[in-house]
Amino acid sequence: MMTINICRDFTETPGARYKSEGEFSGEEFRDDLLKHKYLEARARNEKLIIELDGGYGYATSFLEEAFGGLARMYPQNEVLDTLSFVSNDEPSLIKEINEYIIHANDKKKRKH
């Protein structure tokens, strides 16, 4: 089992959606950390635990771009099967993120 603690491994102050909007964006997190750990977990047939606690909160745009964006890059069912979220501080984030993953896949289909 692999783990990313966003606060420890990325930042305590997550930013907006895109790199062009400033530091610590969802896009930066996905491209620089999440994607690589996700692919490593898939190759090892392991879960990737995402620990959300410890920071100063998340913009919805950060979460959608990071996790919804991953589901636009890779099959939605594989993303859902591989990622597991932990949030004792704000448990509702887990459902919110799973919804972004599910709906990101639908948006991808509509673009074609």
Task: Indicate where each model-derived feature is located.
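Amphipathic alpha-helical interaction surfaces in cytosolic regulatory modules
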Residues: D9-E46, I50-N98
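Short, Lys/Arg-rich amphipathic alpha-helical interaction segments
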Residues: K95-H112
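Short amphipathic
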Residues: M1-R8
